[in-house]
Amino acid sequence: MADSHSHSSLEEIRATRLEKAEQLRQLGLNPYAYTWEITHQAQDLQETYRDLSNGEEVDLKVAIAGRILARRVMGKLAFFTLQDESGTIQLYLEKQRLTEHMPELENAFNLLKKITDVGDILGVTGTLKRTEKGELSVYVQTYAVLTKSLLPLPDKWHGLTDTEKRYRQRYVDLIVNPTVRQTFRRRAQITAAIRRYLDKQGFIEIETPVLQGESGGAEARPFITHHNTLGMPLYLRIATELHLKRLVVGGFEKVFELGRIFRNEGVSTRHNPEFTSIEVYQAYVDYNEMMALTEALVTTAAQAVLGTLKITYQGEEIDLTPPWKRITMHEAVQLETGIDFSQFTDLETAKQAATKAGIGVPEDCPSLGHLLNHAFEQKVEGTLMQPTFIIDFPVEISPLAKPHRSKPGLVERFELFVYGRELANSFSELTDPIDQRSRLEAQAAKKAAGDLEAHSVDEDFLTALEYGMPPTGGLGIGIDRLVMLLTDSPSIRDVIAFPLLKNQEAGSDG
């Protein structure tokens, strides 16, 4: 066990702590308090009084609360480390001082020694002093056990090092790992910064349905559920795209939604079935303006949490300073493989050339566009360390994007790659309802033939397009991957508070 407590010892510890909770009750003290009035937080005190001299005391009334992370008792003195959300501070507890300030409680110091444990949540009042050894401390006058913990924290030597257990018991992970708390603070700062920027640019956020009658907006396998009263199947959304486009049809010219997406697919360091994305739509612009918006959103987020655009991710120096490199998918593949796929008109000839270049070609590869994408994913994607816009995708893999205005067979689409990973996807949105119907019907045929990720025909969406959708640029950014990048987190599970995990038999956590 990573936390060094056996199942039997855990039961013994729990039983002992239950007894301590009962002892508090017998003294008329509630081991699960209702409130505690707080005047300061630990980090504020550390920063405000960092210049306090050793041995100096400040006549400042302090009331704080937090979790006991460590405790040392030496005769008539005790030193606790208390952690609140902001940080830690030492509690300096003296027998005589507690006796003076807590006369209603017989032998308050001995009771403190007897009934408190690491993990308990404690409230204290007192003044502030720096000990002779230089530790800023709350010089405690009164205390109260606010929550009696029943289970022990992982010991300080081993910590919580089992990765699977860290994800499964995130609440313990957050208690003992300050860097994990910092990751989720930064995640909140990133989403707040993105929303602030869009708000200043005149965008509004509108929530669209999570439960949908049709699954569309991306090539992905949906989760299916059933509405009992209506007697109909429903799908958890795999994208917000089609509903946000309906809003553009309805007259919202700058609209976005930042929210959860659900895809019934595999789990990896980059994929979780439930994840967060932001989709942004702006009328009267194309994918060129969306590239500028992507640069603005990512750099705004980086500045908000790091204060710089030169970052390090997993040991790789990455410069987020715009403008970012732009290269077509055809050009990128040709640079890496020497093959100009735009010259091919025959699929079989192209497959032979790809195979000769070491590109794995699926037997059922249906088109030159799909083959180009296979070549890109295998030979190019992993090389794109610095932020790079890959532009102008094949129409065969982009059923919702507008045809390229000067390159037949391609669409006006880009994806942003950083550290070999896709971070954003964008189109000049397809607004021709006849072309859109044709493409969705082709997707539906693929679905009928067994492709579980192909699009359905969303008749209501097509009806909306027939009322007329203005020229529109659309953008999607994976928030989880952006947070990974800006917090130097190797796995998507590190940036999702409660990632999806396999079922675990009762008790196997220890």
UniProtKB/Swiss-Prot annotation:
Pfam families to which the protein is assigned, alphabetical: tRNA-synt_2, tRNA_anti-codon
Cofactor or coenzyme needed: Mg(2+)
PROSITE patterns referenced in this protein's UniProt entry, alphabetically: AA_TRNA_LIGASE_II
Keyword Metal-binding recorded: yes
Domain of life where this protein originates: Bacteria
Any one of the GO BP annotations: lysyl-tRNA aminoacylation
Reactions performed catalytically: tRNA(Lys) + L-lysine + ATP = L-lysyl-tRNA(Lys) + AMP + diphosphate
SUPFAM superfamilies: Class II aaRS and biotin synthetases (SSF55681), Nucleic acid-binding proteins (SSF50249)
UniProt KW Metal-binding keyword: yes
EC number: 6.1.1.6
Family named by the database record: Belongs to the class-II aminoacyl-tRNA synthetase family.
Binding site for Mg(2+) 1: 415, 422
Entry binding sites for Mg(2+) 2: 422
This protein's name: Lysine--tRNA ligase
Name of the gene this protein is made from: lysS
Keyword list, A-Z: Aminoacyl-tRNA synthetase, ATP-binding, Cytoplasm, Ligase, Magnesium, Metal-binding, Nucleotide-binding, Protein biosynthesis
Subunit structure: Homodimer.
Species of provenance: Synechocystis sp. (strain ATCC 27184 / PCC 6803 / Kazusa)
Compartment list: Cytoplasm
Cellular compartments per GO CC: cytoplasm
Co-factor binding comment: Binds 3 Mg(2+) ions per subunit.
